[in-house]
Structures are given as structure tokens and as C-alpha cells.
Amino acid sequence: MKDVEAWTTLVSPSSSRDPRKLAERAQRLESDGWDGASLVDSQCLMGDAFAVLTLAAVSTSTLKLGTGTSNPVTRHPSVLANLAATVQVISGGRMSLGIGRGDSALAHIGARPATVATFDKVLSMLKSYLRNDGVPMSDSASMLAVGRPGLDGIAIANAPETSRLHWLPADLPPVEIEVAASGPKVIAAAARHADWISFSLGADEHRLQWAIDVAREEMDRAGREPGSVRFGAYLPLYPHVDVEFARELSRGIVTSHSRFAVMSNSITGPVSESQRTNLERVKSTYDMTKHGDAAGAHSKVLDDDYIDQFALVGDPDRCVERIERLVDIGIERFNFWTADLDGKAGESYGLAVESILPRVPNRGRSPATPSLD
């Protein structure tokens, strides 16, 4: 069995998004024993993700790093691959490119998520760029938003035959591609191209099992080996002795990730009637100006039972039991959203580090001694 990884985020909903603070947080996360940390890549809500990840890379030595998540629209695939590869080199091979169809990064510039067809094409191109295989010039040019495809009429006697990252060193593995997915079409695209598929379906093992089955069926159809794609999950993790407080901490993230299941105005995957009711409420009330914010009115529409199913909240032992069940069905990377490090929310973060992180099954490292700062 391959090692299970426990990641968290370089920002929590209430923490500072000042890039100068995030390198310090990366150091803290590394000392607390996390395997990796991801960063939101949304240009209107955060500083540049790759600049911050570079800063985090030179400030740490073992912490894996990734975007959570990039999108196929705001950067050309060659630019996105180049940025990820640069962090890969600087970090000594610790970079993972997390990507989805696009959400807040596009909504805040007045655009919708990329189509699944575009996303599929971009995944194929990213894979080629990151492995230093040539991308056909026609494919590369087709992704230019305002450029002028073709080289006719300009002074070039001998043009490159393909588009590639010529500078990539040969001594490092390619950047892993991790797709954030919730619906069957995106899961299938990821199964054809990605190294990891991380599901935004919460901690409901029945919905996650459905998603894994969709991925495995497409992998088989595409002729990919069973172990060539690994599975992860984006999960809110908010342990606390006061379960009501834990639910309140989780509401913003639970709501924003629940929305992914209804982004196209239809519910993806198997759901109970109660889950359907809550998802319909999210669909009709979501306020993008309060994205991920527990103070947003949209976060108040969720029932406690729904939050308890979607998130890992309350008793740490119960959280660990659920994590163990998810490992049993094939989840090997946990992308945990956790609370801020300080204040009362810090009590939840401390429990996550002290009472849950060391008990995540099959991790390939000894837990670190949590920081008491």
C-alpha cells in the first residue's frame, strides 16, 4: 500500500492572506507534521499563488506544496506548467499542481468555469508540458485568448515544431497533476490524464465510493493501470469539544465545497433527500462575495446533520474513525481545511494536530512534535 498523505491549507478562512505571513505559516505547518499544504489560486482573493509557494518552498524542507486549485482559463497551459515546474525545481520536487475547471478566480472577473471539453484538452497539454513532451503548435495556439495564432507574415525562417518547456532539468520527476472533481464528466477527464483525483464531495463515504467507481471505470476504459491514479478528498476538519462551535467553524468551507455539486444547476452523484434539500438551498443562496466565509448568509442554510455528514467535526475519536473508513475505500490524500492557528479557533487546530494527525492511517512519516507557539 502506498503512503497516505495528510495536507492542510496555507490559509484558513479567518487567517491573514498577507503573503509575508504565509511563509511563517508554512514553517509552522511543517513543524506540526503535515505532509503538504495547498494554497488558493484566485487572483482577486489572494496574492499570486506561485510567488507565495516559491517563498514557502525556500522556507521549508519537507512540506509538499500545491495549488488548491488553479484553473485552465486565467493562464495559458504553457504558463501554468512553467510556473508549477519552477516551484518543483526550487522545492526539490515537492510541488503538486492542483487544478479544477475554475470557480472564484473566474467569477471575480465575470466568467464561468471552463467547459469539460476545454478542461480535458488542457489536462492533456499540461501533462505533455510537465513531462517535456511536445505540444502541437495548433493546440497551443488554440488556447490563446487574445493572441494571433500562426507564424505567417513574420520574420522567422525556422520555427519550433512543437511547444515545450526547453529548460526543464532532467533530474527531477514531473510535477504531479491533481484534479479537483465532483461531477462524473470531470472525474472521467481526470481519470484519463491526472496523477491524483481529489473529490470535493465531503466525508460521505457513499458519495466518495461512487466517485471512485466512476474514476476506475474510466481508467479501465482508457487503458490506464489501476495504480496510476490515486484518490484524495477535500475535507473540512474541525474537531472541538463543543460540536456547535466546530460546526460554526466549518460552515463557510462546507458551503463553498457543497456548491461544487450544484455549480451547473443540477446535483451530481447519489444524494439522500436531506442532502438534496441542503444542496438546493446552497444553489439558490450562494453569495460569491462571501466565498468560503462562515459569515455569509449562504452558510446559514445548512442543517446540522448535513454539516456532520459533509465535514469532520466535534469529537476527535469520531473524526479518526471516519478517516479510517475513507482510507479503507481508497482515499490516500486528505486535503484538510483546518481552523486558524490562534484564539479559540486554535483549539480546534491544536486538536487536529495533536489528536488526529498522528492517527491518520498508513502515513509514511513519524508525526512531528506539535508547535506550542
Residue ranges, per PLM feature:
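Short, acidic/polar
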Residues: 16-28, 83, 180-189, 316-325
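Conserved, mostly hydrophobic/aromatic
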Residues: 33, 56, 87, 190, ...
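Hydrophobic faces of well-ordered beta-strands that scaffold small-molecule active sites
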Residues: 4-10, 37-39, 65-68, 95-99, ...
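Active-site mouth loops of central-metabolism enzymes
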Residues: 4-20, 70-77, 171-182, 237-240, ...
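An alpha-helical appendage that flanks or caps ligand/catalytic pockets
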Residues: 112-168, 208-328, 363-373
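Structural motif
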Residues: 32, 90, 192-193, 329-331
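Acidic-and-aromatic substrate-binding clefts and catalytic sites of carbohydrate-active enzymes
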Residues: 14-18, 40-48, 72-78, 204-208, ...
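N-terminal beta1-alpha1-beta2 module of alpha/beta enzyme domains
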Residues: 1-67, 175, 367-373
